[in-house]
């Protein structure tokens, strides 16, 4: 197309390369100037600047950042070392105070122990007095109930039996007396008749016997009959029962004896308890007071120094490694960059030939030559599409995301992430050494706990000896009397049983009631007394006191528990302050430095990620813009689209229309070229037509509006070198109309 009017260049004029051409109207560019010198850099000049390529510079910047981080970490570790040594001194002082804590706590604990013993003994005294009195009255009540119950049963049984026996005997005696007299009279009459008859018989016998000088005595039964007639039971047959009835025991003697015997040991025990425990006071001077302790584990201990020295050596080693690796990487980066520069130079030389071909957009040619790799990436991505419009959009999106500014943002973000990675590796190496310091500090804590344990065990052993002696004294002076009283009470019960048995033996011994009465006594009283004796025997066997002994870890249990592995909260350790993340102040200093560096690395990582996201956003903007035009139909001339350029027509200023597709032409006359059919989309192909001579075309009023619609133009170098009929330097393809850049 033709511009509406000629313009003036806004850039300095270029060298007149085309002035040496055989045909200045051809527009072909001479490859080299006549003297062989070029204003642009050659291959050797380009290779001389390989060492300042972007990757080497970025790696060197990463190295500088890592060295700064290592120096900062080393300075922080030096500060942490001073703070750790100060904290170690504080821990040493605190450990000495804790190790001396038994000295201060023992006085209060001793007072607490003594007061507890005194209160316990006072309560024991009151309990003993109440128990002794209660047992005394209970035993007396039970015994009184037993023997009075037995007395009632005994009286009921004996008196009832005696009354029944006496009545039966009296009735039997009266019956026998009356019956025996009648029987005696009847027997006397019969015997008198028999005696008369028998005497008559004897008289006859005597008559015969007198002849021989002998005589037979006569039978005389009168005296026996008289005795039989006067026979009767004696009146003293029930005197024994009457005597038994009137002589039943009342056990008053047993009661008085029992009361006296049973109360004696109880009263004696109460008297001894009052005398011994009236105002019991524990001797506090017997309880020990441990001496103060002075711990020293910072002086002469190089654990902390060796830890920080190892950290410093680690940082220095890491610094050397990073210097070596990054410098080698930066140096090695020059090799591929040199090879890339060589390929770029060759590619530029090859693609510079595209300038000679009029079938290409000159701006595209400049882009391909100046940005060979990004242009090649765009062309490769666009090759997946068959539509030329979409190919152009894909290349445009790639070019938008790979501009020098966009790539600078991307490289800056990648370099930042690489720097953060190096710092992270250094930080991880330092964090791995923290357990060594924790082990050293753990040894300090163990020393404090061991000192506390020894002091606590020594104090507990001495205090337990005093408590054991007090237990023995109370068991002998108080519960010894309880044992004595239980033995005496058992003896008293035995005496009561023996005394009662003696009374029953004296009263009913040899009678039919003795066995039943003894069975009733054994059932009613004997078994109960045996139960009481068993209870007294149990009291005798278990009547002793044992005050609890003090554990050996009284003063060290809390400190040992705070540093144990079972503690879930690190700040519970006695070496740490409330809210600390670790179990001691020394490790907390190192952790604080590590957290500080970690926060810095995290911040830098976030910043680098944000920078990369900015590049991603830029790339997305290009992709979204390309996608928005991906399915838009090409507009015709009547719809605001551009007109098809079929001929090369130049104006007086030297501008000609550049076709974007191949225009086959076998004629040399531009005016006689046939108009080709419009293609569906422009393609970047080499034109096979020859360059025709430009001719002046009148400038119409519509040319300026056509130029605004976006027609591409290529300046004809031959005519561009002439200004007012004279040779002139080549001007820029950018023209200015009334101070307006087009």
Curated annotation (Swiss-Prot):
Entry GO terms, CC: mating projection tip; plasma membrane
Compartments reported by the entry: Cell membrane
Cytoplasmic side of membrane: 76-137, 342-395, 625-742
Extracellular compartment segments: 1-54, 159-320, 419-603
Domain of life: Eukaryota
Keywords in alphabetical order: Cell membrane, Conjugation, Glycoprotein, Membrane, Transmembrane, Transmembrane helix
A Gene Ontology biological process term: plasma membrane fusion involved in cytogamy
TM spans (from-to): 55-75, 138-158, 321-341, 396-418, 604-624
Positions glycosylated per UniProt: 177, 222, 245, 256, 274, 454, 483, 490, 505, 552, 566
Cross-referenced InterPro entries: PRM1
Membrane topology qualifier: Multi-pass membrane protein
UniProt similarity note: Belongs to the PRM1 family.
Function: Involved in cell fusion during mating by stabilizing the plasma membrane fusion event.
Name of this chain's protein: Plasma membrane fusion protein prm1
Gene: prm1
């Amino acid at each position: 197309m033709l511009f509406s009017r000629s313009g003036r260049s806004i850039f300095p004029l270029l060298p007149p390369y085309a002035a040496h051409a055989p045909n200045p109207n051809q527009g072909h560019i001479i490859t080299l100037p006549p003297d062989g010198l070029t204003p642009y850099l050659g291959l050797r000049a380009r290779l001389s600047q390989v060492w300042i390529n972007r990757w080497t510079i970025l790696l060197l910047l990463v190295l500088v950042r890592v060295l700064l981080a290592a120096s900062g970490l080393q300075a922080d570790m030096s500060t942490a070392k001073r703070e750790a040594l100060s904290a170690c001194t504080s821990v040493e002082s605190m450990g000495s105070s804790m190790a001396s804590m038994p000295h201060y706590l023992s006085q209060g604990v001793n007072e607490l122990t003594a007061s507890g013993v005194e209160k316990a003994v006072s309560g024991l005294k009151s309990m003993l007095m109440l128990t002794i009195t209660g047992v005394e009255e209970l035993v007396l009540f039970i015994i009184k109930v037993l023997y009075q119950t037995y007395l009632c049963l005994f009286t009921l049984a004996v008196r009832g039996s005696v009354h029944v026996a006496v009545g039966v005997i009296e009735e039997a005696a009266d019956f026998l007396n009356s019956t025996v007299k009648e029987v005696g009279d009847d027997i006397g009459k019969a015997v008198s008749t028999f005696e008369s008859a028998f005497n008559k018989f004897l008289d006859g016998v005597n008559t015969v016997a007198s002849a021989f000088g002998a005589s037979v005595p006569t039978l005389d039964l009168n005296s026996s009959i008289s005795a039989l007639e006067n026979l009767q039971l004696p009146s003293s047959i029930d005197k024994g029962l009457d005597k038994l009835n009137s002589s039943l025991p009342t056990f008053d003697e047993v009661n008085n004896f029992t009361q006296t015997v049973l109360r004696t040991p109880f009263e004696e025990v109460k008297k001894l308890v009052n005398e011994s425990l009236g105002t019991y006071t524990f001797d506090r001077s017997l309880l020990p007071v441990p001496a103060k302790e002075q711990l020293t584990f910072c002086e002469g201990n190089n654990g902390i120094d060796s830890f920080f020295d190892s950290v410093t050596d680690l940082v220095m080693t890491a610094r050397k490694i990073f210097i070596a690796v990054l410098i080698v990487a930066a140096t090695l980066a020059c090799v591929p960059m040199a090879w890339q520069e060589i390929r770029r130079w060759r590619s530029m030389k090859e693609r510079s030939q595209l300038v000679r071909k009029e079938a290409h957009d000159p701006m595209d040619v400049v882009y391909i030559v100046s940005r060979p790799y990004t242009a090649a990436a765009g062309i490769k991505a666009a090759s997946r599409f068959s539509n030329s419009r979409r190919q152009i959009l894909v290349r445009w999106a790639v070019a938008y995301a790979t501009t020098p500014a966009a790539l600078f943002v991307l490289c800056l973000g990648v370099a930042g992430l690489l720097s953060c990675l190096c710092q992270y590796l250094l930080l991880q190496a330092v964090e791995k050494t923290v357990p060594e310091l924790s082990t050293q500090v753990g040894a300090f804590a163990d020393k404090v706990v061991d000192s506390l344990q020894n002091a606590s065990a020594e104090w507990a052993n001495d205090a337990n000896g005093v408590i054991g002696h007090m237990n023995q004294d109370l068991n002998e002076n108080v519960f010894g009397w309880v044992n004595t009283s239980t033995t005496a009470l058992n003896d008293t019960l035995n005496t009561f049983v023996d005394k009662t048995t003696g009374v029953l033996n004296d009263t009913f011994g040899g009678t039919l009631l003795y066995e039943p009465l003894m069975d009733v006594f054994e059932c009613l009283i004997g078994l109960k007394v045996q139960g009481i004796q068993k209870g007294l025997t149990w009291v005798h066997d278990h009547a002793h006191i044992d005050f609890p002994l003090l554990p050996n870890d009284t003063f060290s249990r809390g400190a040992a528990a705070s540093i144990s592995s079972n503690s879930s909260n690190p700040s519970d350790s006695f070496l740490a302050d409330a809210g600390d993340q670790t179990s001691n102040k020394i490790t907390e200093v190192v952790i604080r430095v590590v957290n500080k560096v970690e926060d810095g690395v995290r911040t830098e990582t976030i910043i680098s990620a944000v920078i990369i996201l900015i590049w991603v956003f830029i790339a997305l903007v290009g992709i979204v813009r390309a996608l928005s035009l991906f399915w838009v139909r090409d507009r015709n001339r009547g719809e605001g689209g551009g007109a098809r350029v079929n001929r090369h027509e130049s104006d007086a200023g030297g501008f000609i229309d550049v076709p974007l597709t191949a225009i086959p032409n076998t004629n040399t006359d531009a005016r006689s070229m046939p108009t080709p059919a419009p293609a569906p989309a422009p393609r970047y192909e080499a034109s096979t037509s020859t360059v025709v001579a430009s001719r002046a075309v009148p400038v119409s009023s519509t040319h300026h509006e056509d130029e605004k619609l976006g027609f591409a133009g290529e300046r004809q170098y031959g005519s561009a070198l002439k200004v007012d009929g004279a040779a002139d330097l080549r001007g820029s393809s950018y023209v200015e109309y009334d101070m307006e850049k087009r």
